[in-house]
Amino acid sequence: MKKQISNLDKLTLSNDFLFKHVMLRKRICKHILEELFHTKIADITYLEAEQTLDVYPDSHGIRLDVRIADDTDTHYNLEMQVKNPVNRTGEFQLPKRTRYYQAMLDTDMLQKGQDYDELSPTYIIFFCLFDFFEDSQRIYTFKRRCLENMEIELADEAAIMFLNTLGTKGDVSPDIQSLFDYINSNTVTSKFTREVADTITEIKNDKKVRDSYMTYEMRMKDIREESLAEGEAKQKLRVAKLMLAKGCYSLQEIVELSGLSIDNIEKLKNDMHIEKQA
């Protein structure tokens, strides 16, 4: 019998679901951190007791970042970014997402009883298949500095790194460059990316992962449908408000054109009347 090919079989490392599962392989993840920071790391620990597919608080997506601590208690947050996301007003989301991740990392540490002056060093790391800053750097690293004197750094031990897989400027190790090439083209060019490719094959054949991916797909489908329904509901409300404001449509006409129930329209009419009087 011919084996049925699932969506999981088609995924490459640039997919955030698969990227997370590869990063959960300690040997690979530790090696990437060692190559990025040019240092030996004795061990890493995953900060989530159980690796789950967490939904963002605003239900706009599923969190697929990986949180790690090394033997020096430096904390890392890793995530794959294939697209440059924008919000509904057209504003790029990544810069403010870094604030969310930083708050999450710090809050987790403080909840464990640490005083703020004991907060661990943190690195928020995005693997990006696009050049967010359009300067062709392979790595963009951000730390807080004084605007009046850029030599003065605020020593809060928090850094944000954007790894640009398309970059051509700046030095990275051969294994990091081969990883970038593998992310971009799915082409093995080194012993390390051969290990990554073999690991991906193992992951795709793991029944638990396959079941997890089915759950992930269903949850993503639910989120998309909820977002669509939310958008449709807002559009219906907007149409009804405009028609009520015009004052020349009957309630039945508004029901037919907006798709809202007559009870909802009457409530909306009362709310608008109260707002007008306020």
Give, region by region, the residue ranges found by the protein language model.
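Accessory alpha/beta interaction modules
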Residues: M1-A159, K169, A278
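Short amphipathic alpha-helical signal-transduction/dimerization elements
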Residues: Q102, D106, L129, G167, ...
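Short, charged alpha-helical interaction segments and adjacent helix-coil junctions
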Residues: K2-D9, L13, F17, A69-D71, ...
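C-terminal segments that line or cap access tunnels to active or ligand-binding sites in enzymes
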Residues: E157-K169, S178-I183
